[in-house]
C-alpha cells in the first residue's frame, strides 16, 4: 500500500510540476513563491497533546513534508523556521509578540503568492476533532485558498470532517500580512485518535500531499 501511494505521488508530482512550470513559462515569470509558516517553536511549545506530543514539533514535521512536495512541483518555498526555534531574540521582553512581528515582516518582505500557516488545535472536550482552515474575513483570495484547502481535508479525513473554512479578523498574521494567507489547523491534539493520526508518518505524508495539491490548484487558477 505504501509503495503504491509513493508511486502515485511520483506520477502526480510530475504532472503537477508540469502545470506550474508551464504556467510560469507562458507568463515568462519566475516560479511562484509560497511561504510555509510552522507555528510556535523554541520556548513556545504550542498545544500539548493528550499523548504528550508538542504542537511545535508536529507543525515543523508537516511543514517540511509540504515543502518537499511543493519544491518537487516546481514551487519556490520559504520557511519561516526550519528548526526548533522561534523568531524572537532572547533579550526580547515579550517573545510571543516579537515572534509574530518577525514572522509578519519576513512574509511581507518576501511578498509570496500565498502563505500557509501550519498549526494544531486543542479543545477542552476530547470528542471534538477535525481539520479547519482560517482566512482573513475580507480577503477574497484568502477565502478561495481556504475553501480549496478545506475541501482537501476530505481526502484524509473523509466525510467525518464536517468543518468549513472560517473567516477571522483577530489573528495577528491574518490582520497584518499583505498577501493571501491561511491558517491550517490540521487536527485536535486533545482527541486521542486524532493525536495518534497526527503523529503517524503515513498520515503526515498524506496530509502534506493533499495540502500541496490544493495549493497547486490555487496557483494554477490565478
Placement of each model-derived feature along the sequence:
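Active-site-adjacent mobile loop/cap segments within catalytic or ligand-binding domains
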Residues: 110, 124, 162-222
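Short gly/ser/thr-rich secondary-structure transition/capping motifs
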Residues: 17-18, 96-98, 163-168
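Active-site-adjacent substrate-binding region
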Residues: 142-167
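Hydrophobic/aromatic residues positioned on beta-strands within the core alpha/beta folds
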Residues: 37-38, 186
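Hydrophobic membrane-insertion alpha-helices, especially the h-region
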Residues: 1-14
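Short, charged, low-complexity patches
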Residues: 59, 142, 146, 200, ...
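Catalytic-core regions of hydrolytic enzymes
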Residues: 19-34, 40-145
